Amino acid sequence: MTKPIIALLYDFDKTLCTTDMEDYAFIPALGYTPAEFWHKANTFGRENRMDGLLAYMYTMIAECRAQGKDLKRDFLVACGRSMELFPGVREWFQRINAFGEQQGVTIEHYVLSSGLKEIIEGSGIAHEFKQIYACEFYYDEAGAACWPKLDVNFTNKTQFVYRINKGVLDVADDKTLNDSMPDDSKRVPFTNMIYVGDGL
């Protein structure tokens, strides 16, 4: 008999790590304080009536280019190694998985974050997650970030809740996601989801 699945959905910034993930290494590498960088990104977004996350991703690329640097994937992953996780986070996954086993359920972990997937991949806990839904860059043939590949903003996070619900985890698969599906065919019922975050 298949065990019921309990999905734990996590925000990342200020939930698993202590502040915005870009603050630890990426922003200092550009010579800014976090306050300076976020003011620049937020001002750019407001002045251009942009989604705030697209504005910060644009600002990341623009500031790197202004300093003669390419924004490379490996650099962002390396930035994740400087991340400070809250006490107990690293041990949490093994503990809750074992508890789930005792209760006769399977625990799955997912990230729904407005931070950067690449930085999360360097955090040391990325392997704990079945899927990481977070902002992500597309990289050109030279390996430099040139376009947002995925934007996970504060309201479209609900799309990914539906993906987990239906078991349609591939972000490029909109057809299956939008197809009608009987409730008893959905992989993870909404009642089996727990969202962990400082806000949704």
Show which residues each predicted segment covers:
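Alpha-helical substrate-recognition element adjacent to the catalytic core
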Residues: T2-C146
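Conserved Lys-Pro-Asp/Glu-containing loop-to-beta segment of HAD-superfamily phosphomonoesterases
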Residues: N156-L200
